[in-house]
Curated annotation (Swiss-Prot):
Protein name (record): Phosphoglycerate kinase
Listed GO MF terms: ADP binding; ATP binding; phosphoglycerate kinase activity
GO BP: gluconeogenesis; glycolytic process
Keywords on record: ATP-binding, Cytoplasm, Glycolysis, Kinase, Nucleotide-binding, Transferase
Pathway annotation: Carbohydrate degradation; glycolysis; pyruvate from D-glyceraldehyde 3-phosphate: step 2/5
Length: 396
């Protein structure tokens, strides 16, 4: 995929509108996790250093076109300027007189954060008039928010039609990593898909079995597939009504020559709680009054062996109830094996999605993967093979 980056842009003394992701977690008016802010520093710092007037566009929360103090981006100014190590100006609107006055006052290298774009209904509607009102304050447009790229909103997609458009460094890193993961990967490719429910990942599974060489199914989802094969999963989380869908996916995988790897043994418990009494059983002998809470040792060995044969790995979703010890065992063991192979230079590893990031952090290996996407919805839609409007408009 070819797209325009900051290397293609002349930004000296230009007003550069930069779409960033500042939808950060807050508690009592304080930002509790700086990850998303840290990701956008390279783009902002580079533009400022090159003498651009840097104007940041972002949304926060879901205000549905109504301004409110709790959804104001003013709360982000302090942590942003601290992480940037650069003063950040703030405008109380993203369009109109207040925005224009703040932009007009900028000197080369200055950084300005405009108020929440979603305080205007035109943002989510991608309203042409709102797009023009935003564009009035910029000469160039840079999108550095892959996490919002699956939405065709004014600040994520509309602006790229009216201003010269470029990918920021965080966007560029994400797109290059994803290209290695599924776009044009080194083979064989193994995908790990876990999490609770098959119903939320049907599009994902259908896309992956056409693109990968082996698909590991774990977490609560695996129970639905085991049940579809006629096995008794006891009181485990299971979508019995999707048994025929699971069988269709397995049949399709045979025709696309994608090996499906399901657990062969399981750690079962009698209560959904940490440190509940537990025991390992083969998946063909799970007690009727127990529930599967993690994959067993034979299963993790099977997954590790598939990873040893792979050149590329894409991961979305944990292999068990990782938030409850000891049912984090399979997720941690496999994650550490992936990290080891990656560090040895034998594997390209891409992981993403909320629970996945939390699980890899829990295993202490998030920094050892080739790339971890914090994008959530956009990462999933990319894995599902769906078009991403905010990315498509950046292509050369």
């Amino acid at each position: 995929m070819m797209f325009r980056t900051l290397d293609d842009a002349n930004v000296q003394s230009k007003r550069v509108l930069v779409r960033v992701d500042l939808n950060v977690p807050m508690a009592n008016g304080e930002v509790t996790d700086l990850t998303r802010i840290e990701r956008i520093v390279p783009t902002i710092a580079e533009l400022s250093r090159k003498g651009a007037k840097v104007i940041l566009l972002a949304h926060f929360g879901r205000p549905k076109g109504v301004a409110s103090d709790e959804n104001s981006l003013k709360h982000v100014v302090k942590p942003l300027s601290k992480v940037l190590d650069h003063s950040v100006h703030f405008a109380e609107d993203c369009i109109g007189d207040k925005a224009k006055a703040a932009v007009d006052a900028l000197k080369d290298g200055d950084v300005l954060l405009l108020e929440n774009t979603r305080f205007h209904k035109g943002e989510e509607k991608n309203d042409p008039e709102f797009v023009q009102a935003l564009a009035a304050n910029g000469d160039l447009y840079v999108n550095d928010a892959f996490s919002a790229a699956h939405r065709a909103h004014a600040s994520t997609e509309g602006l790229a039609h009216v201003l010269p458009a470029f990918a920021g460094r965080a966007m560029q890193a994400e797109l290059e990593a994803l290209e290695k993961g599924l776009g044009n990967p080194a083979r064989p490719v193994v995908a790990i898909v876990g999490g609770a429910k098959v119903s939320t990942k049907l599009d994902l599974l259908s896309n992956l079995i056409e693109k990968v060489d082996a698909l590991v199914i774990g977490g609560g989802m695996a129970n639905t597939f085991l049940a579809a094969k006629g096995l008794d999963v006891g009181k485990s989380l299971c979508e019995h009504e999707l048994a025929s869908t699971a069988r269709e996916i397995m049949a399709k995988a045979e025709t696309t020559k994608c090996a499906i790897i399901l657990p062969v043994d399981a750690i079962v418990g009698w209560h959904f709680a940490a440190d509940t009494p537990h025991q390992t059983y083969g998946v063909d002998s799970v007690p009727g009054d127990a529930m599967i809470l993690d994959a067993g040792e034979l299963s993790t060995d099977l997954i590790a062996s598939a990873i040893d044969d792979a050149a590329t790995l894409v991961w979305n979703g944990p292999l068990g109830a990782f938030e409850l010890r000891p049912f984090d065992t399979a997720t941690v063991k496999v994650a550490r094996h992936v990290a080891k192979r990656t560090k040895e230079g034998k594997l390209v590893s891409v992981g993403g999605g909320g629970d996945t990031v939390a699980a890899l952090n829990h295993a202490g290996v998030a920094d050892d993967f080739t790339y971890i996407s914090t994008a959530g919805g956009a990462f999933l839609e990319w894995m599902e093979g769906k078009p991403l409007p905010g990315v498509d408009v950046l292509k050369k």
